[in-house]
Amino acid sequence: MKVLHLDSGIFLEQSVSRQVSQNIVNKLKEKQDITLFHRDLVANPVPHLAADELLAEEKPLIDELVQELLDADTLVIGAPMYNFTIPTQLKAWFDRVLQAGVTFKYTEQGPQGLVNGKKVYIASGRGGIYSQGEAQAMDHQESYLKQVLAFIGITDVTIIRAEGMNMGDEPRQQGFKEAEQEIETI
């Protein structure tokens, strides 16, 4: 199985999403042989969209990123919540891999995803608790990820969430415990 592992947590070793995404990869390795490709979107950022970058010199990078996506059977995405959404580094990656005619196409019925049959695990790290209650309305992280993945045809998405990371020691430990319990079910 080919696994594309994306990390976008800016806090590197202290990043909750990096820790959880690595634990997901480790669990996948326990279960079967995998070929792993790791792309660190912080250490090696994908440039943000700009008019000048949409010229021909960007095509090799776009082709490389799209091919990594297409080659993978499984994606593991380390996606922390920053200001209620995903990091700009991860958004820049999506901006490059959403390519009309390659990862989706327009039809008379609307857009149709072309990246089918893949499994995605999202390692979601959050300082607060946004999966329930009034704060759920502020979650533009997981909802965005599910929608953008569905747009390109990927609907088999499992979110492994570590919440409450900045709410004190007890909620932090509970958040990690719940994430680890979810990982054990993979």
Swiss-Prot record:
Short name of one Pfam family: Flavodoxin_2
GO molecular function: electron transfer activity; FMN binding; oxidoreductase activity, acting on NAD(P)H as acceptor; oxidoreductase activity, acting on NAD(P)H, quinone or similar compound as acceptor
Keywords for the protein's UniProt record, in alphabetical order: Flavoprotein, FMN, NAD, Oxidoreductase
EC numbers: 1.6.5.-, 1.7.1.17
Entries under InterPro entries matching the protein: Flavodoxin_fold, Flavoprotein-like_sf, FMN-dep_NADH:Q_OxRdtase_AzoR1, NADH:quinone_OxRdtase_FMN_depd
Residues that coordinate or bind FMN: 15-17, 81-84
Chemical reaction(s) catalysed: 2 a quinone + NADH + H(+) = 2 a 1,4-benzosemiquinone + NAD(+); N,N-dimethyl-1,4-phenylenediamine + anthranilate + 2 NAD(+) = 2-(4-dimethylaminophenyl)diazenylbenzoate + 2 NADH + 2 H(+)
Cofactor field: FMN
Gene3D superfamilies assigned to the protein according to its UniProt record, in alphabetical order: 3.40.50.360
Free-text comment on the cofactor: Binds 1 FMN per subunit.
Assembly and oligomerization: Homodimer.
Family assignment from sequence similarity: Belongs to the azoreductase type 1 family.
Function noted in UniProt: Quinone reductase that provides resistance to thiol-specific stress caused by electrophilic quinones. Also exhibits azoreductase activity. Catalyzes the reductive cleavage of the azo bond in aromatic azo compounds to the corresponding amines.
Name of the protein in its database record: FMN-dependent NADH:quinone oxidoreductase 1
Organism: Idiomarina loihiensis (strain ATCC BAA-735 / DSM 15497 / L2-TR)
Gene (UniProt): azoR1
